[in-house]
Amino acid sequence: MSEKRKSNKIIGIDLGTTNSCVSVMEGGQPKVIASSEGTRTTPSIVAFKGGETLVGIPAKRQAVTNPEKTLASTKRFIGRKFSEVESEIKTVPYKVAPNSKGDAVFDVEQKLYTPEEIGAQILMKMKETAEAYLGETVTEAVITVPAYFNDSQRASTKDAGRIAGLDVKRIIPEPTAAALAYGIDKEGDKKIAVFDLGGGTFDISILEIGDGVFEVLSTNGDTHLGGDDFDGVIINWMLDEFKKQEGIDLSKDNMALQRLKDAAEKAKIELSGVSSTEINQPFITIDANGPKHLALTLTRAQFEHLASSLIERTKQPCAQALKDAKLSASDIDDVLLVGGMSRMPAVQAVVKEIFGKEPNKGVNPDEVVAIGAAIQGGVLGGEVKDVLLLDVIPLSLGIETLGGVMTPLVERNTTIPTQKKQIFSTAADNQPAVTIVVLQGERPMAKDNKEIGRFDLTDIPPAPRGHPQIEVTFDIDANGILHVSAKDAASGREQKIRIEASSGLKEDEIQQMIRDAELHKEEDKQRKEASDVKNEADGMIFRAEKAVKDYHDKIPAELVKEIEEHIEKVRQAIKEDASTTAIKAASDELSTHMQKIGEAMQAQSASAAASSAANAQGGPNINSEDLKKHSFSTRPPAGGSASSTDNIEDADVEIVDKPE
């Protein structure tokens, strides 16, 4: 089979906490691509079962029976240390552990998987979805991230793309992508707010759009607030109610928790459209008295009360974003709702309260981010003209200086790409080296901000304190990823660093993960081929047994025996888990013998036809006078030859008078 040709398309991928989506520019318009399961979004879930890796819907289907090996909402762990994810660990049934570097990783049967590897599995699924639609190999993508993702999380997302076999041309914030999708065909200048409440994160961005220019004025958010947290309040309510009713604590039962998670998500979605919903989970557990069933009614009002503190947490970031943009709520022309949680009526009511206007519901909150990513892909690929995207960094970047102080070099909401330089010096006489500690955050003291990297500038010539001139340069690319350099003016000595993800993936580790991903891809392909061959063999057995049953009396006994023997050979090959080649060979042999049934039936039909023809020619004589008394036309007998009908004409009709 010939390999697919390489596509020149840059696809857009929304790598979401709960669901992911892929889009591509086609004929100048963005198109969301449906998955092989027929859905326009794919659950961001990866599961390990029986040596197989399942992604998307197949992974979600088996989550209830395999909770410890089903990894969902892994985006909340990407680019983060184990010490930073304590609250997230409590909400998932799988095991999260620290690796040797203190990074948060997933422990599945003693094998550790990084969040980048799991993200790569989801990205591969998106890549394959696009390739199946385009009929071409896709190698380039624009991937979206929450606007409030820090440098480490952005770098980790880019690494996940590389592991998936993608050249990530740009990382762009989700609200910015949504604004692109909304404003690409709009005329005139507008100031818009993008309120993005997704599965795991909350972002608010203020943009000014007009004449093809999309300028982000400010951004803010909460990377610990999303749909998972709303599910959590329903789960906790169900646990409390069940404990009151039955005296049983389900919180330690992972299988029951996974069922409650699914039920909570379903109830949450339903309550956006109805005022109450029934939650029924039969046989949720069992005790000495027998099985127990969970049956509860949750009203919209109850849910809004349970989630009120979560909804309240969206207000402060919105106020800060407006303040940073130097705008008031009345200056905003339109508010876009993005993310599945923005469908909740109480959330929409808060948006109206904050901005003083009804939010715009004209975009699909599940697809608009992927559409915007595809448009940005079109811009980078030259397919979309006259569009300029000016993004910002979400958090200030700086270094630690004397006294443990954070000295910012690049303030938050600075437009990127950008470069900033500042001169620093030594703190002691004859200091031979300085350690550059790179920080991200808004607090005045270094220890209260996030350290995202460090490096040493050595061999500084001896000099009194304060004399050496050390120029520190912060260079931020269009992806929001930071490169730092430090140069000693006297010696010309320079040291550079690209800020790696806090997950600490080195280049050799990334390359190994790329190789592993390719290996698993080939293994999965072989497993699918083996499964297809077994399924085909099973089908062949069924068809053969049916044919033998239906035609047992019409085919030779020795052929019946041969077919039954070959049926048994195929069945045995499947049972013994023989090689794909062996099963296929046995199946092909059975297929060959199945053809003999048709041959035997044809031979029998030919014999019957010959016998019928002989009877037609040598049968009893019919008096022609008698024939004339019938009012019908004669036709050749079945199986009769053409020559036997040469002299037969339509019979004349004779009217016979009725006796009086």
UniProtKB/Swiss-Prot annotation:
- For region Disordered, the annotated ranges are 608-660
GO MF annotation, one: heat shock protein binding
Family matches, as Pfam families: HSP70
Q: Which UniProt keywords apply?
A: ATP-binding, Chaperone, Nucleotide-binding, Phosphoprotein, Stress response
Determine if Nucleotide-binding is one of this entry's keywords. Answer: yes
Q: GO biological process: what's one of them?
A: chaperone cofactor-dependent protein refolding
| Residues with PTM Phosphothreonine | T201
Looking up InterPro entries in the UniProt record yields: ATPase_NBD, Chaperone_DnaK, Heat_shock_70_CS, HSP70_C_sf, HSP70_peptide-bd_sf, Hsp_70_fam
- Bias (Low complexity) ranges: 608-617
Q: Which Gene3D superfamilies match?
A: 1.20.1270.10, 3.30.420.40, Actin, Chain A, domain 4, Substrate Binding Domain Of DNAk, Chain A, domain 1
Phosphoprotein as a keyword of this entry, yes or no, is yes
| Record's note on what induces expression | By stress conditions e.g. heat shock.
Q: NCBIfam families per the record?
A: PRK00290.1, prok_dnaK
Q: What else is known?
A: Expressed early during infection.
What family is it from?
Answer: Belongs to the heat shock protein 70 family.
Name of this chain's protein: Chaperone protein DnaK
Q: Which organism is it from?
A: Chlamydia trachomatis serovar D (strain ATCC VR-885 / DSM 19411 / UW-3/Cx)
